[in-house]
Design a protein with these regions (language model features):
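C-terminal SET catalytic tail plus cysteine-rich post-SET Zn-binding segment of SAM-dependent SET-domain
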Residues: 89-175
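Catalytic cores of histone-lysine modification enzymes
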Residues: 2-98
């Protein structure tokens, strides 16, 4: 599919996933049944926006991610929170990215396990951050920021599974 401003992408969440209260933060996504390695769990949906659309306030703040240079996926301003945004962060997540909108399992995920993703896989806004991470992972960074994708240990851990824009930056600049 050729991405262009205004296109609406329908979200998809595997029916083996449920959203419920999370010990990490607010609401989270949990496996109703186990998943094997490299299984598609979620395809983000939303509207494709330009930077101009964002500046004009057409996109809901907090729902936007860079999917190509100059193009963003997010919900329209005023839209209710969708279930595909109930995915909590972990510094050693059990999901990662297959492409700009598809999230897959890194390994086997057991029934009742919370599905998590490291926000460094797509977050590029230097002003964005989580002051206190509560993931509890041995790899916990303590704080999470919009430039964490530049950390060598994350580039090694998640090689090939960042958002394509970030993968391109890593290859071009050699962070």
């Amino acid at each position: 599919m050729k991405l262009r401003p205004g296109i609406v992408i329908a979200p998809w969440i595997d029916p083996r996933v449920e959203v419920r209260d999370s010990p990490l933060h607010g609401r989270g996504m949990f496996a109703r049944e186990s998943f094997g390695s490299d299984e598609v769990v979620l395809i983000w949906g939303g509207t494709v926006f330009t930077e101009g659309d964002l500046k004009a306030g057409r996109a809901k703040p907090g729902s936007v991610t860079l999917i190509e240079e100059g193009l963003y996926l997010g919900d329209p301003a005023g839209a209710p929170e969708a279930d595909d945004y109930c995915l909590n962060h972990s510094c050693d997540s059990n999901l990662w990215m297959r492409d700009a909108i598809t999230l897959v399992t890194r390994d086997v995920v057991e029934e009742d396990e919370e599905l998590t993703i490291d926000y460094a896989l797509w977050e590029t806004d230097p002003a964005w951050g989580i002051e206190t991470c509560r993931c509890g992972s041995p790899h916990c960074r303590g704080t999470v920021g919009g430039t964490d994708w530049r950390l060598p240990e994350l580039q090694e851990r998640y090689a090939g599974h960042f958002a394509p824009v970030i993968e391109g930056w890593i290859e071009a600049v050699g962070y």
